[in-house]
């Protein structure tokens, strides 16, 4: 019997590349599955998930509020901030404070990104969000095309090199708000119609094995991930991957699962999510 094709969507960034290194390089047995890696920015993947286009996909925890009828969350593959996370940056000389952001032009990586939900929970609704490819946000802030930028991915480590300063760290804000919960950002999810026999638990175990392989073979996984770092040297790539691929990526933990539910609950109560969220994890 031919291997079953699984289209696996993830972002072209170092942490996702690190997670799926073992699968991309055929370093572990794939248990009757064949993977096609499809790399797109997270907002594109969020949109595709509304259509159920991919069998397994990275998506924003925020977006999952609208996707739970099509997808279940995998119990691993999460990106979470531990007192750090997406941040808002402005030009170094700009006299801008967080409470001014609702009335300013703010570059964001997407309306369904977790970072945008968290920003609005922190400061209120942003009246003029400017949707911008995540890898251009630092540039448009530096150029003065917007007043501020919401930075995800490796820009969190490099913004100062472009003459920018941080005015808000959403990981710090969330930690204080919730009494220490990690900040939910990205998740991996599997389409519900694969729930036949043992398909879902087998897939889940295999994807966890890929993450574990990367953590156990860090040098090779980092070399693979570095090519997606958009100018990061190996030391910075290692630092960035360490922020978002770690033991919690192997399993959310009870507090990680609680954090997902808490974020979506707060978003719904604030009127930022228009449906009561269902949080449904695959158990493997």
Regions found by a protein language model. Give the residues of each.
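Bilobed "Venus flytrap"/periplasmic-binding protein-like clamshell domains
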Residues: 3-25, 39, 86-148, 153-157, ...
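Hydrophobic/proline-rich hinge and linker segments of small-molecule sensing/allosteric domains
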Residues: 73-96, 176-193
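Conserved C-terminal helix/tail region of periplasmic/extracytoplasmic solute-binding proteins
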Residues: 266-284
């Amino acid at each position: 019997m031919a291997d079953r094709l699984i289209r696996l969507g993830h972002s072209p960034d170092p942490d996702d590349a690190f997670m799926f290194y073992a699968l991309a390089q055929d370093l572990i047995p794939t248990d009757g599955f064949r993977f096609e890696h499809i790399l797109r920015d997270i907002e594109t993947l969020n949109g595709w998930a509304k259509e159920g286009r991919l069998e397994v996909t990275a998506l924003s925890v925020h977006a999952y509020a609208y996707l739970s009828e099509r997808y279940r969350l995998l119990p691993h593959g999460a990106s979470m901030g531990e007192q750090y996370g997406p941040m808002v940056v402005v030009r170094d000389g700009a006299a801008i404070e967080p409470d001014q952001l609702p009335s300013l032009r703010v570059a964001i990586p997407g309306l369904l990104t977790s970072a945008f939900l968290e920003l609005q929970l922190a400061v209120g609704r942003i009246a003029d969000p400017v949707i911008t490819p995540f890898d251009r946000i630092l540039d448009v802030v530096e150029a003065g095309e917007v007043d501020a930028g919401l930075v995800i991915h490796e820009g969190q480590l490099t913004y100062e090199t472009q003459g920018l300063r941080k005015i808000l760290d959403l990981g710090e804000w969330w930690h204080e708000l919730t009494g220490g919960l990690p900040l939910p950002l990205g998740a991996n999810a599997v389409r519900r119609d694969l729930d036949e026999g043992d398909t879902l638990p087998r897939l889940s175990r295999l994807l966890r094995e890929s993450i574990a392989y990367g953590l156990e073979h860090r040098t090779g996984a980092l070399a693979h991930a570095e090519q997606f770092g958009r100018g990061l040297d190996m030391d910075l790539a290692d630092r960035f991957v360490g922020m978002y691929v770690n033991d919690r990526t192997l399993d959310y933990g009870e507090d990680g699962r609680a954090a997902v539910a808490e974020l979506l609950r707060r978003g719904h109560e604030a009127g930022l999510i228009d449906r009561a969220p269902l949080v449904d994890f695959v158990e493997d």
